[in-house]
């Protein structure tokens, strides 16, 4: 039912009127592309733009100011082409980062890190006689080989059965006879940290889908990973640059309903006013998109409703006790296991932002921790956030393959859930959604 006051968006010329709902990377990229030849109105329910591009202005006790990212942190020059193009057009400056990961297990006392050479892998002499750990290192190589072998099987190959192509990570590991030690101390920490999911959920990820991501990012070899970078001054720099190109930015303006009318779309915002647009891009999480559609189709229910998200409580703080005790084992990403057989409900990972963003060494480290709320000293907490991340199951991956069925010439969907859930996936989906409703990035 269309109720409320109707209003048209003021045009600056004869340009089309286009709205983008949601200002994460997908919405910002769509808005940037569409702003080339359209008047764009950007709706954002929050008090700030950016979504996971979330930069905090921090002042230390000596009065020094730092910009610390807590959501989107790193990108690389190999697998982020859409985001890099956006940065280039905006004049965004980036800098090289330190990409490494550690695992610390409270149960057996294990601490090690990858990406830092031998001193990280063997931070203490005792690991040289730790049979389980040394066997795990050999299993890593075997895992890389078997994962690449699965990817090399054509999906229509007669040698490939539905069970091998559709198997979960947990099934893949069991069939490959990988040890529980390897699963607990290498595999689930890797997946859980990368996708911000709990370890049990990590084992339910579709193996082939997961391995395609790892291979794409050079993570199915001991070496060969791309060079990772961060935005100088924080990711807020690109957010501000995009915002300057948009005709109208509406913060604190949740969208309550989206109505489709053939060759136009109406939006009812928080003030109950109806506004008509030539086209709309919905760049929210899928469940939010489904909620604001006034007349969702059966297909939209099936597809958008099949994509779960995890909710992660996140803290920006200075409590270094969440990092490994051994300085040689400390890394940029630091995964914590309460016990060797632990399957915590939430991911427990800490990002050393001083290392990742190459902040000045002042004797105080700025850390972002997902999960582990009770582990962090209250007087060290600077800010608290909640982020949501897409989760991947055989069902959600199947639904993802149908997303293109939902788009039309006047309404398209965007979000990192169209891909692997990362900033490049969001940017690429924003570009494609903008093009679907008539935008051109030239």
What are these language model-derived features?
Residues 57, 113-116, 344-442:
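Conserved flavin/dinucleotide-binding core of flavoenzymes
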Residues 56-83:
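N-terminal glycine-rich dinucleotide-binding loop that anchors FAD/FMN and/or NAD(P) in oxidoreductases
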Residues 35-59:
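Glycine-rich FAD pyrophosphate-binding loop
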Residues 1-18, 36-37, 58, 393, ...:
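Extreme N-terminal leader/targeting segments of oxidoreductases
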Residues 256-390:
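Mid-domain catalytic core of redox enzymes
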Residues 212-270, 275:
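Helical element adjacent to the flavin cofactor pocket in flavoenzyme catalytic cores
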Residues 16-42:
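N-terminal Rossmann-like FAD-binding beta1-loop-alpha1 element of flavoenzymes
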Residues 77-204, 211:
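Mobile amphipathic helical/loop "lid" adjacent to a hydrophobic cofactor/ligand pocket
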């Amino acid at each position: 039912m269309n109720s409320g006051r109707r209003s048209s968006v003021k045009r600056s010329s004869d340009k089309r009127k286009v709205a983008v709902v949601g200002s994460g990377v997908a919405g910002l990229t769509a808005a940037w592309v569409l702003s080339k030849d359209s008047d764009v109105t950007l709706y954002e329910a929050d008090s700030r733009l950016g979504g996971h591009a979330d930069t905090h202005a921090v002042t230390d006790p000596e009065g020094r100011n730092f910009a610390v990212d807590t959501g989107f942190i790193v990108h690389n020059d190999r697998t982020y082409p859409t985001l890099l193009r956006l940065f280039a057009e905006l004049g965004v400056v980036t800098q090289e980062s330190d990409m490494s990961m550690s695992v610390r297990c409270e149960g057996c006392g294990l601490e090690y890190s990858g990406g830092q050479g031998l001193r990280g892998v063997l931070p203490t002499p005792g690991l040289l006689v730790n049979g389980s750990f040394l066997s795990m290192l050999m299993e890593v190589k075997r895992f890389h080989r078997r994962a690449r072998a699965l990817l090399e099987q054509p999906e229509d190959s007669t040698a490939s059965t539905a069970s091998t192509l559709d198997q979960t990570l947990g099934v893949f590991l069991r069939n490959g006879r990988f040890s529980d030690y390897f699963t607990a101390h290498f595999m689930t920490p890797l997946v859980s940290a990368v996708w911000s999911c709990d370890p049990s959920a990590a084992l339910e990820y579709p193996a082939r889908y997961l391995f395609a991501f790892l291979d794409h990012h050079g993570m199915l070899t001991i070496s060969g990973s791309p060079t990772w970078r961060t935005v100088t001054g924080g990711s807020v720099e690109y957010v501000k640059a995009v915002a300057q190109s948009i005709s109208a930015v509406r913060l604190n303006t949740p969208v309550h309903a989206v109505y489709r009318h053939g060759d136009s779309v109406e939006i009812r915002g928080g003030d109950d006013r109806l506004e008509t647009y030539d086209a709309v891009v919905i760049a929210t999480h899928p469940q939010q998109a489904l909620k604001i559609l006034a007349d969702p189709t059966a297909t939209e229910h099936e597809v958008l409703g099949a994509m779960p998200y995890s909710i992660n409580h996140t803290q920006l703080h200075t409590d270094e006790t969440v990092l490994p005790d051994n300085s040689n084992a400390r890394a940029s990403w630091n995964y914590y296991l309460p016990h060797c057989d632990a399957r915590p409900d939430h991911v427990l990972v800490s990002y050393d932002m001083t290392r990742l963003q190459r902040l000045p060494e002042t004797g105080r480290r700025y850390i972002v921790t997902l999960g582990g709320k009770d582990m962090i000293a209250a007087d060290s907490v600077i800010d608290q956030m909640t982020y949501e991340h897409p989760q991947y199951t055989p069902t959600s991956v199947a639904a993802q393959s149908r997303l293109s069925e939902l788009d039309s010439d006047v309404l398209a969907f965007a979000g990192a859930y169209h891909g692997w859930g990362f900033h490049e996936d969001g940017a690429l989906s924003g570009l494609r959604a903008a093009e679907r409703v008539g935008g051109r990035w030239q």
